[in-house]
From Swiss-Prot:
Pfam families associated with the record: Enolase_C (PF00113), Enolase_N (PF03952)
Oligomeric and partner information: Component of the RNA degradosome, a multiprotein complex involved in RNA processing and mRNA degradation.
Free-text function comment from the UniProt entry: Catalyzes the reversible conversion of 2-phosphoglycerate (2-PG) into phosphoenolpyruvate (PEP). It is essential for the degradation of carbohydrates via glycolysis.
Organism: Aliivibrio fischeri (strain MJ11)
Top-level taxonomy: Bacteria, Pseudomonadati, Pseudomonadota, Gammaproteobacteria, Vibrionales
Name assigned to this protein: Enolase
Length: 432
């Protein structure tokens, strides 16, 4: 029934107009799973390798024909005849065949696309939704929850062509009783934010993740205009809607000088000064979560940040941990951050992703399931969030089909599961 008979890779286009890898896994029973790898813009230096061709004559060097060739060649040969239900075995075969610590031979984009396609094929063979199959792979069959969305409604940093240093300003619809109601709140705030920005003469063009990307006077002004939009939508900031930020601070860290250079504001900070800057913002606004608040290598600074803010705020490690259990284990041991961002292309397989989520939860850290800035219509992260009962998801704003595809899948899942998948809102956020 679930024996693999064919593995196929192809080059498709992502939401930024760059190529990415799509894979199909065909089973003897006729079931097929298909999945595509996402791609990041602000990336951690210790992420698994995304293999690009480097041929400047094609897609400005960003082609993925080498990764596709790995799928259609050695990966396909190794997996044909194997049982798709044995996800850990499938993933380990590809990891061993690649033979590197960071999947540099085949590319994490090749291995991940096949890994996810395999999971989809196996779920189909078992006549169950992907989220239910993921729950079984996770060792938590039948345990589900609907995630609280972190909705990125103002884009800056590497995700936008503007002067805003902090990469993401997000809202969380914590006053909602259901995921679907939360999305309605998010949409209403998003539309009111457009009106607020227009009234101030700001652009309402959007960035990579569907949030607005205006040139603002300061990072604090981003929070101020969001606060205005929340009120204009008829909601109470701090009660119905809370705030979150992804600083992506590695992108404005001057390694040689050892300072954080926020060019948009013309300010520089030491690690300790930047931690106090974030603390001041959190005092002024109901910010409940801060991601990558320092450079990925600034572990001493992160330790100070955790001591300063960790009992009050969720401190999420993205570039810091890169969905890697070895690095996460070090962070847990040293008491650095209290949450991990989960991006399965940072590590390159579903099995390793599930291991990172489990390690985080076992240590009392939260796990936030995340998209990348380069996405496709693939909505697997919605099923991952529900099937692991992770509790939180980051998948962009209320525009761009590559973002909304994930929200729409969550709506379908909530409809199917009903009370079996509670929406716990702010209770899911560390420190709240």
């Amino acid at each position: 029934m679930s024996k693999i008979v064919k593995v196929l890779g192809r080059e498709i286009i992502d939401s930024r107009g760059n190529p990415t890898v799509e894979a199909e896994v065909h089973l003897e029973s006729g079931f097929v799973g298909m999945a595509a790898a996402p791609s990041g813009a602000s990336t951690g230096s210790r992420e698994a390798l995304e293999l690009r061709d480097g041929d400047k004559a094609r897609f400005l060097g960003k082609g993925v024909l080498k990764a596709v060739a790995a799928v259609n060649g050695p990966i396909a040969e190794a997996l044909i005849g194997k049982d798709a239900k044995n996800q850990a075995e499938i993933d380990q075969i590809m990891i061993d065949l690649d033979g590197t610590d960071n999947k540099a031979n085949f590319g994490a984009n090749a291995i991940l696309a096949v890994s996810l396609a395999n999971a989809k094929a196996a779920a189909a063979a078992k006549s169950m939704p992907l989220y239910a199959h993921i729950a079984e792979l996770n060792g938590t069959p039948g345990v589900f929850s609907m995630p609280l969305p972190m909705m990125n409604i103002i884009n800056g940093g590497e995700h936008a062509d503007n002067n805003v240093d902090i990469q993401e300003f997000m809202i969380q619809p914590v006053g909602a009783k259901t995921l679907k109601e939360g999305l309605r709140i998010g949409a209403e705030v998003f539309h009111n934010l457009a009106k607020v920005l227009k009234s101030k003469g700001y652009s309402t063009a959007v960035g990579d993740e569907g949030g607005f990307a205006p040139n603002l006077k300061s990072n604090a002004e981003a929070l101020e205009v969001i606060a205005e939009a929340v009120a204009a939508a008829g909601y109470e900031l701090g009660k119905d809607v809370t705030l979150a930020m992804d600083c992506a601070a590695s992108e404005f860290f001057d390694k040689e000088a050892g300072i954080y250079n926020m060019k948009g504001e013309g300010k520089t900070f030491t690690s300790e000064e930047f931690n106090h800057y974030l603390a001041e913002l959190a005092n002024q606004f109901p910010i409940v979560s801060i991601e990558d608040g320092l450079d990925e290598s600034d572990w001493a600074g992160f330790k100070h940040q955790t001591e300063l803010l960790g009992d009050k705020l969720q401190l999420v490690g993205d570039d810091l941990f890169v969905t890697n259990t070895k690095i996460l284990a070090e962070g847990i041991e040293k008491g650095v951050a209290n949450s991990i961002l989960i991006k399965f292309n940072q590590i390159g397989s579903l099995t390793e992703t599930l291991a990172a989520i489990k390690m985080a939860k076992d240590a009392g850290y939260t796990a936030v399931i995340s998209h990348r800035s380069g996405e496709t219509e693939d909505a697997t992260i919605a099923d991952l969030a529900v099937g692991t009962a992770a509790g939180q998801i980051k998948t962009g704003s209320m525009s761009r089909s590559d973002r909304v595809a994930k929200y729409n899948q969550l709506i379908r899942i909530e409809e199917a599961l009903g009370e079996k998948a509670p929406f716990n809102g702010l209770k899911e956020v560390k420190g709240q």
